[in-house]
């Protein structure tokens, strides 16, 4: 009897689904996308035959050249916007084996179920699978489920659907738009600004947000202000701290020490009389169940997870069947989910924690209500009971579990008190709050202490308080806060830029391109990021407009719902975009994109005597001779490195940013904070932070010490030279002063051990591609990974039996592993694991994918079984 074939996109998901389907189904994974538009540099078809231009005039030759360049561009992009958006999809490298297996299984199957994820990306994967496998469309059915549970899968297979081509076309539209912008604008940036630059339809808009915030911070001028607090005692000698809030009926707002001291002098001799004590009930409602953006934000603030890590862990939890689908913008909960939560609350917390009716939360206008919020698949699966999940995945599940319960619990109830005291013309206040009923905070306590969470001492109206001390405090206004990953996601969501499925990719891409970087989990715009943003803003105003980008997301939603035609929208976009691109490609004098400008200075070139200019490259700011613009034979290539005078503003913590801004010189032309660099022992240059848009700079002469390197030093394991601490786009690392060797800085601040050359095992083939395994030794011990990483990212633990078989290939430091037992007492294969706590490798085993309790340690030169 033939079986039905079920195709999903991940092995973990296939493993979970397989537990719930009967023997009449064969469940296989496509391991993500199986085909895509061509990668850069891939060859597609035969090369076009050259066209002879002999005898043609200049206009005809230019026309032939333009046609040739256009055809080459279309070939690289893999889509042809000039001919009805014809796409050249190709099987992804390394996926040939997967495709061959799926085709073979499909031939034998009586029906094929495409069970990829329920979002547009999942719909597109399903469509690509159907297109590649081929055959009658009637053989294919689409099944979707919001959670990988027995009941959800049963319902999905009872009511299979057809592929939704509107959703597929929405995904293709997004892909084509991004492809066009990236492939057609990036070469322009290479030509006009600097080689190696790139642009993205949504990513460039996200960078714009960060650049604007960077400039707000640099332009910000801190202003002084003072606060005055008064420490008093009531008649029972209980301490009460009062803040001065008003003076003569207006807000108390001293701008300097003189104004503050005037108040202090009066308050030191004044009487303090209680004039009012108001107590009223207040409450704190629970937040809605998680959607993608709020999960990312809360995981960042409560757990310290980055957006990418949060989504990776959520994906694993979903594929293991523990939570519902993690890419959603809907706060909707099914009736079954509500019943599950309410039953659990009543049984485990009591009736007082159960509202009369379920709590409902509104979703944003374009949210897909068919989707649910992120919640546990089964509330009875407690965090500590999860099997096969790493520690951080369990922590994330615990957060989701608690938020789901909290959202269906009553508000926390407080008694909030405000004490008002007068001292002459001054009004002082103290606030307190007492928790009367914890409500939802029973399962999800609020983080951070509220300064009002105190019980005010007992006082009566007209009571006089005894003065203990008057405390004036100087403050300075703070610049706008820098974006964290979580805050940036919140801002993107608020502006309607991107969707739940794209936030993580946007955050990752803008960091990888080098236009921004993160330090202490906060974003800093690099100078090149500012320049590229300016050029794109000037030449592609509509593309960089926040509202236009948000409206395009709405258009994609309309395509997905079948309201508008996808190619009509693509054609309209391309028409407008092509017009802007043509203008941008012109010379600057004709209205084209401005080149990467320089700022000429009075500093003379030490080689030719011409003026030096402030230039910006991807690596930073430097001085370059203006003679570089001359013809090759006369060209002067002299450059001078600029050494930052001290730690730059962008490596300081947020609390220090105000002081740093105050200490920096201000540009006399635009008022922006200046960056200071040492040129040599006798000169320093202060450059406007808004360079090159502002040509302000200042030369300071004197005697300056060029600070040498005084950081940590380790010996290079390749050449023996010193390795120094450096800062790159992905954070701190150790770099050799002599060769190109680098070493990571671990999360605990230690320098990672030297990188060992991988040991190749061509005999050990990967399961997911045609690659073979190599043995790598990293910061977390040894492991097997594909030899062509990162093209193939397949990894697995090292088996002792393999090390024994190929002992002669092992480096001396790893030879001891080959002496470990090859199997446990139950004949399960022994594998190598690494203990982060003890920082050493040990041997254990697995049975049916789960770790056994058998552990062997290497102690005193021999392998010893650990006592249970």
UniProtKB/Swiss-Prot annotation:
Protein EC: 5.6.2.1
UniProt GO molecular function: DNA binding; DNA topoisomerase type I (single strand cut, ATP-independent) activity; zinc ion binding
Top-level taxon of the source organism: Bacteria
GO cellular component: chromosome
ZnF segments: C4-type: 605-636, 667-694, 716-739
Residues reported in the UniProt entry to bind Mg(2+): 9, 117
Annotated ranges, domain Topo IA-type catalytic: 164-581
One GO BP: DNA topological change
Cofactors required: Mg(2+)
Entry-linked SMART domains: TOP1Ac, TOP1Bc, TOPRIM
Domain Toprim: 3-148
Site (Interaction with DNA) residue list: 33, 174-175, 178, 190, 327, 513
Catalytic site positions: 325
One Pfam family per UniProt: Zn_ribbon_bTOP1
Catalytic activity: ATP-independent breakage of single-stranded DNA, followed by passage and rejoining
Keywords of this entry: DNA-binding, Isomerase, Magnesium, Metal-binding, Repeat, Topoisomerase, Zinc, Zinc-finger
Region feature Interaction with DNA, mapped onto this chain: 198-203
HAMAP family, alphabetized: Topoisom_1_prok
Cited function: Releases the supercoiling and torsional tension of DNA, which is introduced during the DNA replication and transcription, by transiently cleaving and rejoining one strand of the DNA duplex. Introduces a single-strand break via transesterification at a target site in duplex DNA. The scissile phosphodiester is attacked by the catalytic tyrosine of the enzyme, resulting in the formation of a DNA-(5'-phosphotyrosyl)-enzyme intermediate and the expulsion of a 3'-OH DNA strand. The free DNA strand then undergoes passage around the unbroken strand, thus removing DNA supercoils.
Protein family: Belongs to the type IA topoisomerase family.
Subunit-level organization: Monomer.
Name of the protein described by the UniProt record: DNA topoisomerase 1
């Amino acid at each position: 009897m033939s079986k039905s074939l079920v195709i999903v996109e991940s092995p973990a998901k296939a493993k979970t689904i397989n537990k719930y389907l009967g023997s009449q189904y064969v469940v296989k994974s496509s391991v993500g996308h199986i085909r895509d538009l061509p990668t850069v540099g891939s060859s597609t078809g035969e090369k076009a035959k050259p066209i002879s231009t002999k005898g043609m005039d200049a206009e005809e030759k230019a026309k032939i050249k333009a046609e040739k360049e256009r055809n080459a561009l279309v070939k690289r992009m893999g889509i042809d916007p000039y001919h009805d958006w014809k796409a050249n999809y190709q099987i992804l490298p390394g996926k040939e084996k997967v495709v061959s297996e799926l085709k073979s299984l499909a031939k034998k199957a009586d029906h094929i179920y495409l069970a990829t994820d329920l979002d547009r990306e999942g719909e597109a994967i399903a469509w690509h699978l159907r297109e590649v496998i081929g055959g009658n469309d009637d053989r294919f059915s689409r099944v979707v489920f919001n959670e990988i549970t027995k009941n959800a899968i049963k319902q999905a297979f009872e009511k299979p659907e057809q592929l939704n081509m509107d959703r597929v076309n929405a995904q293709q539209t997004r892909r084509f738009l991004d492809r066009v912008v990236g492939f057609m604008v990036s070469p322009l940036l290479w030509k006009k600004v600097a080689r190696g630059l790139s642009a993205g339809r949504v990513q460039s808009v996200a960078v714009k947000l960060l650049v604007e915030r960077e400039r707000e911070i640099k332009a910000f001028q801190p202003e002084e202000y003072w606060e005055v607090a008064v420490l008093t005692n009531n008649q029972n000698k209980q301490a009460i701290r009062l803040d001065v809030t008003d003076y003569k009926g207006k807000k108390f707002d001293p701008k300097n020490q003189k104004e503050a001291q005037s108040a202090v002098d009066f308050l030191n001799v004044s009487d303090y009389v209680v004039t009012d004590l108001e107590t009223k009930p207040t409450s704190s409602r629970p937040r809605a169940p998680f959607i993608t953006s709020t999960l990312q934000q809360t995981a960042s603030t409560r757990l310290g997870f980055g957006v990418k890590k949060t989504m990776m862990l959520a994906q694993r939890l979903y594929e293991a069947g523990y939570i519902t689908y993690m890419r959603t913008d809907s706060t909707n909960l099914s009736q079954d989910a509500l019943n599950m939560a309410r039953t659990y609350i009543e049984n485990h917390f009591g009736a007082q924690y159960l509202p009369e009716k379920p709590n409902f939360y509104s979703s944003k206008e374009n949210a897909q209500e068919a989707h649910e919020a992120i919640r546990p698949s089964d509330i009875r699966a407690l965090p500590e009971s999860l099997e096969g999940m790493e520690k951080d995945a369990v922590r994330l599940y615990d957060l989701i579990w608690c938020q789901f319960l909290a959202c269906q619990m009553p508000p926390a109830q407080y008694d909030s008190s405000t004490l008002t005291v007068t001292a002459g013309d001054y009004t002082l206040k103290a606030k307190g709050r007492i928790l009367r009923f914890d409500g939802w905070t029973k399962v999800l306590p609020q983080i951070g202490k509220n300064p009002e969470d105190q019980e005010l001492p007992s006082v009566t109206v007209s009571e006089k308080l005894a003065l203990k001390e008057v405390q004036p405090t100087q403050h300075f206004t703070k610049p706008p806060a820098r974006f964290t990953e979580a805050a940036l996601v919140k801002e993107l969501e608020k502006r309607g830029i991107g969707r739940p499925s794209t936030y993580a990719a946007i955050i990752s891409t803008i960091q990888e391109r080098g236009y921004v970087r993160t330090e202490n989990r906060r974003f800093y715009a690099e100078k090149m990021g500012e320049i590229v943003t300016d050029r794109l803003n000037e030449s592609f105003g509509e593309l960089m407009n926040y509202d236009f980008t948000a409206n395009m997301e709405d258009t994609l939603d309309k395509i997905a719902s079948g309201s508008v035609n996808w190619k009509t929208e693509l054609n309209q976009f391309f028409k407008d975009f092509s017009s802007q691109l043509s203008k941008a490609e012109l010379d600057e004098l004709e209205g084209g994109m401005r080149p990467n400008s320089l700022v000429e200075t009075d500093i003379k070139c030490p080689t030719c005597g011409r003026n030096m200019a402030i230039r910006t490259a991807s690596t930073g700011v430097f001085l370059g001779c203006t003679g570089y613009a001359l013809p090759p034979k006369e060209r002067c290539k002299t450059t001078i490195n600029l050494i930052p005078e001290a730690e730059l503003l962008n490596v300081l913590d947020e609390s220090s940013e105000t002081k740093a801004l105050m200490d920096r010189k201000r540009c006399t032309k635009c008022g922006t904070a200046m960056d200071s660099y040492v040129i040599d022992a006798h000169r320093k240059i202060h450059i406007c932070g808004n360079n090159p848009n502002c040509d302000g700079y200042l030369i300071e002469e004197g005697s300056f010490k060029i600070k040498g390197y005084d950081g940590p030093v380790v010996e290079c394991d390749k050449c023996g030279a010193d390795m120094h601490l450096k800062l790159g786009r992905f954070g701190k690392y150790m770099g050799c002063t002599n060769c190109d060797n680098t070493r990571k800085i671990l999360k605990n601040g230690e320098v990672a051990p030297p990188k060992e050359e991988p040991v190749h095992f061509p005999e050990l083939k990967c399961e997911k591609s045609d690659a073979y395994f190599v043995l790598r030794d990293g910061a977390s011990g040894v492991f097997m990974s594909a030899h062509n990483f990162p093209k193939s990212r397949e990894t697995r633990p090292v088996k002792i039996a393999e090390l024994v078989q190929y002992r002669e290939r092992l480096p001396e430091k790893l030879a001891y592993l080959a002496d470990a037992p090859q199997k446990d007492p139950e004949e399960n294969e022994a594998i190598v694991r690494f203990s982060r706590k003890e920082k050493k490798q040990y041997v254990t085993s697995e049975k049916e994918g789960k770790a056994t309790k058998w552990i062997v340690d290497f102690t005193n030169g021999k392998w010893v079984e650990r006592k249970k």
